[in-house]
Amino acid sequence: HKAKAVYVGGCTASYVEQDIAMASVRLLDAAGVDFSYLGEMENCCGTPMMVAGKWNVFKDVMKQNIAAVKAAGADTVITSCPACDMMWRKVYPQWAKKLGIEFGITTKHYSEVVAEKVKAGEFSFPKNGCAPCKVTWHDSCHIGRVSEIYEPPRELIKALPDVELVEMSHNREKAHCCGS
């Protein structure tokens, strides 16, 4: 079906760690988020091409991705991939402007979308019968320092029944790089 938002899993979630995409989609569905998929039209976001200096390949991939989202009738990309989020949120708008391409696409990390539903009282996590536990969150370089998404993942953790968020000593802007 057509929706104003499309879920973009990214290469890792689509081809390597598919449980990430499946869990993200299940969570978005459970929260009542209306979205569709690009399916065969989804390409790599172009991060590898950009960092390798393959500018022409990167530009082609970016143009194809923007066209695919627009052809789907969407104006919002929801992603679970930190690199895709960075590209759609920060890099694509800059390059589209530089190349004279109409962009007009909003990017949201799935944690932002679900946290909005929790805040609005439209979604809550069910009690799962697990013993109380403590959980921490690592702010990745792409999601944290580049896309500046710090609170939504924490809000979701805090919304989980019987789960306590414990902050690492180095968090948010001061989080250590994981080394990837």
Residue ranges and their predicted role:
Residues 1-180:
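Iron-sulfur cluster-binding electron-transfer modules in prokaryotic oxidoreductases
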